[in-house]
Amino acid sequence: MSTDTQIIKLVEEILCEKTNDYDYEGPMPDEAELQKRAEDGMKKFATVFAGMSQEVKENALRSCLIHVAGINHRNKVRKHMQVLKDLVGKGIIPARLLCEQIMSSEKLVYQNQSFWIECFQVVRRVIGGVDYKGVREIMKCCKEKALSFPSGISSSILPQMLELTEVIEHIFNRNACLLPAYFIINEIQKADYQDTHWRIANLIANFIEEFVIVAQMLSIIGHSSMLPIVEHSSYADNLINPWKLDPTTLKLALRGNLPYEPELLQPQIKLLRFVLEQPYSRDMVCSMLNLQKTQKQKCMALEEQLVWLVMCAMECSEKEPVHTVDGEISSHTQWVWLHLSSQLIYFVLFQFATFQNIVNTLHDKLAVSNLRRGRDHLMWVLLQYISGSIQRNSITNFLPILKLYDSLYPEKEPLPVPDYNNPLCTHQMAPTCIWIHLLKRAQSEHYNINRSIPTALKLHHEFLQHLVMPNNNATLCMGSDYRLALLCNAYSTNPDYFSRPMAALIETILGNCKNPSAGGGSTSATQPLPTVPLSMSVLDSLTIHSKMSLIHSIVTHMIKQAQSKTTVPNTNNMAPALVETYSRLLVYTEIESLGIKGFLGQLLPQVFKSAAWGILYTLLEMFSYRMHHIQPHYRVQLLSHLHSLASVPHTNQMQLHSCVESTALRLITGLGSVEVQAQMSRYVTEQKAPGNIVSAESEELNRALILTLARSMQITGTGNDPQSTTWCKELLNSIMQNTPHTWSQHTLQCFPPVLNDLVVQHNVPKENKQLLKKSVDEEYRNWTSMSNENDIIGHFGTAGTPGTPPLFLCLLFKMIVETDTISPVAYKILERIGARALSAHLRKLCDYLVFEVSNSGDGAHVNKCVDTINDMIWKYNIITIDRLVLCLSLRTLEGNEAQVSFCIIQLLLLKTSEFRNRLQEFVSINSPEHWKQNNWHERHLAFHQKFPEKFTPDESVSHPSLPVYFGNVCLRFLPVLDITIHRYLEVPAAMSKTLDVLLDHLGPLYKFHDRPITYLYNTLHYYERMLRDRPQLKKRLVGTVIGSLKDVRPDNWAVTEQYQSYMSKKDDAVNWMPDLNYYIYLVRRMQDTIDGTNIFPGTDWRFNEFPNPPAHALYVTCVELLGLPVGPQGVANSLIDVVVKGYPVIPSQSVHNWINTIGLIMAALPESYWGVIYERLREVISCPQMTDWLHRQSPFELFNFKIVREAMLEKNYVVILAIAQSILHHSGIGQISTVTEHIKENFKPIIKTEYQLIYLCHLVGPFLNRLCAERSRAVSDITLILYELLEQVDKAQPSLALKYMDPICDLLYHIKYMFIGDMMKSDLEAIIRRLRPALQMRLRFITRLNVDEIGVDQQNVDASAAGQGPAQGGPQSQQPQTTGQAGGQPSVPQQQQQTQQQQPQQQQQVQQQ
């Protein structure tokens, strides 16, 4: 007998014994006898069943069910199924096995009514004994069975539907807790239930609705309206994570298969478009879409948005007034096309977008529109790419553009030849230039285009053909017209015709002396080198291909110049026009490979290799004073090169060494706060570091590096987060190893706590100033006692070498004080010491000078000391004012000595007129807008002729001076002035009274600061605590920097008229308290800028300190807010009240945009400002309405912005929540990671109700995803706090029912399966065991809590609740799962780092549970 038959027979026997169904005659057994026989039958069944393998058991049960399904009698079917249920109740058949076999039975079809009904009734009764994994499988089968019903259900099959509905309803029952509801929603979200019976559909819809509020707790209010500020900084992951999109769908990365709001599930086209529209956004776009340059990733979504940008530009051109003949780019639309050209070239060049697809899509759109005004601009954009790439690609790749000619140039008559004196002629001739390139490529490939040029362009074509003939362009030169540009653009791919116009263009800036070996310096004397560079208008009129040819020619010429053996190494006979033009070409990001990459990777190494120090000096000056928007990794790379360069013996020359250090100082102080960690950590943490960013010898540069690090940590909010700054330790160790030093207490107090702790760990012995004075006196006695020159040089020339103190400058100082002169032999000693070693002597001189003045009670002696130092600077040229003041500002001085140093700095700068005269002259005759000038060099020479600058005491002894093209003492002093002002701000007000005087006299120099608003922002942000009670000084700082530019910038370019009025009032007028309308105006101004309205005067963003209008708007707004005579709390509360109280004046469709803008502003302010939002949140959470909920609406309704706005409900809760979420969304990781601390300190002590807890869940829920990626520990901390708060709420109201325990538990399951796994199992289990039984039952799957254990830990607390749980629909006597078995708890990550996985992996994990 087969096992299948045996099992069926045994079931039949049990059935007979139980029902007394006998076929023989005889006395009827009594009830007890029947029961005994049934039990014996079950034991027999159990024995047989236990001996079977799992596969045999399944087959046997399957056969048994098939047998039962074949019975036509309803009662007999019921009795058979009752036997199987009883066998489950006795533990003979596992409940899961029976349910699985029932649900998978091929006979379980709704047409078999009896079998269907009885089966689902059995499942309904035994499912309580199935572990949650088995229940999940049963639910899946129920879903499939529900979908098997016809759309129209007759009364005959309604009972089957009702039985199925009961089982599904029981599975969905929250009190039954058969499996985590999180698994149910994950499963039902996968299918479409539109065609299912209304009972099932209603059941599912209601269950989904329960999870809508869970998704609400995980969603940022107005997320789809959030927009970032696009900066030209390097985009570290922690800055991009909030903005990442799927490159295929453009959708947000939302975790969990939850019913999020529809706008969150849609492609975020608005976000990508906004970013694409911003200049200098290409890196952010690549980071957002995870596009890698090294991989050829086609992004169709990006192609579509590039086409959209083109169409928008075409529409803008339709509205544009007729263009002027102005040579400069004057209209907003022209800037749009310029930016569009850059974007298109970049994304097509790296094959993220396909040129043919873009052109074809454009043709399709333009063919059905009547947009013609922008056609020339469009063809100009396409010409940029075509001219540079057509030689490397087949002609067939470009043929789609021919269709555009048909759509855009349908004229039957030729268009007139444009005026070639107008730069726009290059755009008007662009379609003809494209045609010429296509013909040339077709000719080289022997491809027949087989069509003539459009009639509209015939005259243009004839004009260019005539112009290119040798007899017509033989005398061409760069005049005021654009014929050369036209020829270059049209024939850049035709060497026969391109060489002559390009040669003429180069000759304009190079002069006739093309061969550096011919004549050397004598040629320069006989024939002056060109000084007028190519204007930006001319460069803009050239295609990218022509620009690349031009920059290649310039670099080649410079390298040949450097390699020329007849050129004196320290001289430089490069034409000023050439150098200035080269610097202007470097602003074009489209030619980056030949631009900044070529500068750092080719030109600088070749110049250095050739020891062409004059050219090297010029290039470093150019980088300091002419380069804009250079990506941070290039700047840090150059800094590393400069540190290597500084150690080379050949650069140990005063002027060159000064230039290297000055350039390095600018690079260090110019690093953006968000750039510091991203760039510096590469040089510290990577095993194969690309170089060294720490100076081996310059203490001043390393101090500046630490100050920049401090500022970065403060502004990015990482100064309190040790986890954010682990890499700093290695950097500081390297600095202290190379240049050991200490810091003044007033400076350390301004350092962020983490950096302060790291710095004070390095103990450096403090120098004895009294001993220093004795040593100087001793050296001076040695000097006066020695007469032999060789002995003097031998003794003092080794000063500063190991074992000998670097006191020679102190000696010279004392020599001048005593004798008013310097011995000629001192010059030889200075030359022997060298510029590099002299830095150590300068530090000793500063210490000695401060000690002398501090201990001098005689005012005449103080004046003598200052006069002596001035003589060393201006008369003897031993040291420079910038290096001395920098060194003096950075010395470690406390108390009276610090005050003395400030006094010395003031006297050095202002007592004599030497520096003041230079500054006044330079400021009065020059403009910082060098890109608009063609006579910079003339003014530069005039200044140096009036104020010649020497870098050595006697140039006949040393090397001859290097030619200076850009710099002077005033420009070199700017970064020093920045640092000096910061030192003043660190000390008490009584010690820094002289700062006002310095600002009065030196403030105009900020006219030439390359980042004036950024400097103000950094200063006011970093020193906010020091300046909080000094409103007059804040006003003075802002007024000085912004006022210095009043003659250069248009009105209202930065601060508002209200603030300008405040600045213009008397110094004591610091009691201005702006009203709410003022803050509304500030927010509206920035919001309008983000929306694309031209609020600020137009500017060339290529030369601006900010890359685009929204970035400019953000920083000028922050500067103004930081400069107000109002405390942080007042400003922050007013910004929050812009929405809370100003809600009626905000357009309803723009309210989320305004909240986004407020979040941007607040996140960019110091913690004392954005921290106020936690105070406002605390006020909301602790308000009486939160502790005693009297609203008719649920908390989820009042915390839903859309519902509140549409139903006009109480808005305070949700508005504060929306602003808080906006601030956190825009915050850096250093700021957002503080949320854990704020919850512990501000919220945890006051949360007693579930309404308060739900509000907190709305606050932190949306940011778990980001924290998991960047601070996984924070997710664990927040999770633990949420469980502790749940216990706190539970204990606070033990006799009250918790109305919203289900959504809270659902959120906790989301956290488990999406973030923490089993990592916190032991911590959480202890808390769960202390909760009320209803909560224990719901959370039992998190910690594998058995049903029979629920309520045990409650007995000592609440005897009445002990052992009680929610009503269960079936037997729950067995464990829901067994650890380590197939039906056990889902496999989850065991290590913290394993929880940081991508959403698809986590989704798959949930699906596999």
UniProtKB/Swiss-Prot annotation:
GO terms for biological process: positive regulation of gene expression; regulation of transcription by RNA polymerase II. It is found in: Nucleus. One of its GO terms (cellular component) is transcription regulator complex. Keywords: Activator, Nucleus, Transcription, Transcription regulation. Residues 1359-1409 are annotated as: Disordered. The keyword Disulfide bond does not apply. Signal peptide: none annotated. InterPro entries: Mediator_Med23. It holds the Pfam family Med23. Its main location: nucleus. Component of the Mediator complex, a coactivator involved in the regulated transcription of nearly all RNA polymerase II-dependent genes. Mediator functions as a bridge to convey information from gene-specific regulatory proteins to the basal RNA polymerase II transcription machinery. Mediator is recruited to promoters by direct interactions with regulatory proteins and serves as a scaffold for the assembly of a functional preinitiation complex with RNA polymerase II and the general transcription factors. Component of the Mediator complex. Belongs to the Mediator complex subunit 23 family. This is Mediator of RNA polymerase II transcription subunit 23.
